[in-house]
Structure formats: structure tokens, C-alpha cells
């Protein structure tokens, strides 16, 4: 399968499994799972060719491991990044490493300095244990800035952290006092 097909399909899946399942008449359960046959049928109604082999290839080859298949192979979901109100994945609380990172664009710094990191339309703020990963994320939005999060002190102050299946760290928000520019 060619890279463009995989990337285009990944973007489509991100859209319908994270944000707008109703765009193709798809229903997600509370944990974000969608029936694969319903997804394929909805994609076909939207004029997109999608089959189980392509879905499997996207799940297997996605560099950020954004998607997961159920154990029985009948359902698929986005691992994290949801903005859809019906989805509330029950991530287990986890103890974060001492420092986590967040990549952003320089144009967002004034807002972050004032409000901290907030999830925006998503359910969680996304953090990384790797500087390089966070910088890569920041580059998607413009001139990248790396933020260092004092996750240990934040956790000790009572803020909950979760880790998605793909290794992304999640929290509800990051107050200003735990953020410094790296």
C-alpha cells in the first residue's frame, strides 16, 4: 500500500473517529469504539474506498499508533485525541515521569503564559515523554516552541495523569506554574 493512501486514510479516520463520526453516519460507543462494517459502509456513502485490509495497514503502520483494533477485530477506535462529547475513554491513572514535554507554536505562547495548557476542543492536554516528539508536534502549527512540564510536582499537587495505549500522556490541564520554556 502506498504512503499517500495510508496517510489520507489516517486523516479520514482521525476526523471520523475523534471528532465527527456523524459526518458519515457512524456511531461511537462511550469508549470511542466503532463497528468496522459500519465504518466501511459510511466511508462508501462518503465516496471513500475503505476495506479491512486498508484499515489493518493504517493501524499497523501509523507511526504514532493513533488507532487500535478490538481483540475480536470487529471494532476500531482512535486511541486518544477525541473532541466528541459521547466519548469518554476510561484511562487508568498513571504516575508520570518527572518531566514531560509539550510542543506548540510560538503564536500560542501569550495565551499559554496567561492560561496554562488547556485542551481546547479535545478532552485532554497531550504531553510527550520525548522532547523530539513534542517538537515535531509543535512544527505542525508553525514556528515550534518546546515547553517543559514539571509533571512530578503537578502530580504531587493532585493533578491526574493518564497514558494512552500509544504512549501519549494525558491530563485535563496544565497550570502556568508547572510550565517553563525549554
Curated annotation (Swiss-Prot):
Gene3D superfamilies listed in its UniProt record: 3.20.170.30, RNA 2'-phosphotransferase, Tpt1/KptA family, N-terminal domain
Entry-linked InterPro entries: Ptrans_KptA/Tpt1 (IPR002745), RNA_2'-PTrans_C (IPR042081), RNA_2'-PTrans_KptA (IPR022928), RNA_2'-PTrans_N (IPR042080)
Gene Ontology terms describing biological process: tRNA splicing, via endonucleolytic cleavage and ligation
An example Gene Ontology molecular-function term: tRNA 2'-phosphotransferase activity
EC number: 2.7.1.-
Annotated keywords: NAD, Transferase
Enzyme class: transferase
SUPFAM superfamilies: ADP-ribosylation
Domain of life: Bacteria
Known role: Removes the 2'-phosphate from RNA via an intermediate in which the phosphate is ADP-ribosylated by NAD followed by a presumed transesterification to release the RNA and generate ADP-ribose 1''-2''-cyclic phosphate (APPR>P). May function as an ADP-ribosylase.
UniProt record similarity statement: Belongs to the KptA/TPT1 family.
Protein's name according to its UniProt entry: Probable RNA 2'-phosphotransferase
The organism's taxonomic lineage, starting at the top: Bacteria, Pseudomonadati, Pseudomonadota, Gammaproteobacteria, Pseudomonadales
Gene (name only): kptA
Amino acid at each position: 500500500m502506498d504512503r499517500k493512501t495510508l496517510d489520507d486514510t489516517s486523516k479520514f479516520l482521525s476526523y471520523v473517529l475523534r471528532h465527527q463520526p456523524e459526518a458519515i453516519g457512524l456511531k461511537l460507543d462511550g469508549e470511542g469504539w466503532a463497528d468496522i462494517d459500519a465504518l466501511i459502509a459510511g466511508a462508501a456513502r462518503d465516496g471513500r474506498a475503505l476495506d479491512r485490509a486498508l484499515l489493518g495497514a493504517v493501524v499497523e503502520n501509523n507511526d504514532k499508533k493513533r488507532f487500535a483494533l478490538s481483540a475480536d477485530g470487529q471494532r476500531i477506535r482512535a486511541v486518544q485525541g477525541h473532541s466528541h462529547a459521547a466519548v469518554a475513554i476510561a484511562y487508568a491513572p498513571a504516575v508520570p515521569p518527572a518531566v514531560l514535554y509539550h510542543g506548540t507554536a510560538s503564536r500560542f505562547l501569550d495565551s499559554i503564559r496567561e492560561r496554562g495548557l488547556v485542551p481546547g476542543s479535545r478532552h485532554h492536554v497531550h504531553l510527550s515523554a520525548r522532547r523530539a516528539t513534542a517538537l515535531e508536534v509543535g512544527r505542525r502549527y508553525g514556528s515550534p516552541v518546546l515547553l517543559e512540564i514539571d509533571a512530578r510536582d503537578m502530580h504531587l499537587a493532585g493533578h491526574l495523569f493518564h497514558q494512552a495505549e500509544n504512549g501519549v500522556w494525558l491530563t485535563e490541564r496544565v497550570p502556568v506554574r508547572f510550565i517553563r520554556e525549554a
